[in-house]
Swiss-Prot record:
Biased composition (Basic residues): 26-44
A Pfam family this chain is assigned to: PDE6_gamma
Protein name: Retinal rod rhodopsin-sensitive cGMP 3',5'-cyclic phosphodiesterase subunit gamma
Function, as annotated: Participates in processes of transmission and amplification of the visual signal. cGMP-PDEs are the effector molecules in G-protein-mediated phototransduction in vertebrate rods and cones.
GO MF, one annotated term: 3',5'-cyclic-GMP phosphodiesterase activity
Residues modified as N-acetylmethionine: M1
Known EC number: 3.1.4.35
EC class of the enzyme, as a word: hydrolase
Oligomer and partners: Oligomer composed of two catalytic chains (alpha and beta), an inhibitory chain (gamma) and the delta chain.
Residue ranges, annotated region (Disordered): 1-55
């Protein structure tokens, strides 16, 4: 006497038997560009040429280099500075 229940045959709904075998395609591959291209122009510096307006800095001239980007781009948010690679 056999007490085991009959085994149900499990079939895959997506597999077709007897059809042509094609290799499966993976996810699409994206190529990363070497240079970043922005849709808009990068922001301009806010205050330029204020060397003679500051007391005690008359001899430096108006062509001073700002080291900290927050001084030249103080009208922008940090995420905008990061978007254009300034910081």
């Amino acid at each position: 006497m056999n007490l085991e229940p009959p085994k149900a045959e499990i079939r895959s709904a997506t597999r077709v038997i007897g059809g042509p075998v094609t290799p499966r395609k993976g996810p699409p591959k994206f190529k990363q560009r070497q240079t970043r291209q922005f849709k808009s122009k990068p922001p301009k510096k806010g205050v330029q040429g204020f060397g003679d307006d500051i007391p005690g800095m008359e001899g430096l001239g108006t062509d001073i280099t700002v080291i900290c980007p927050w001084e030249a781009f103080n009208h922008l948010e940090l995420h905008e500075l990061a978007q254009y690679g300034i910081i």
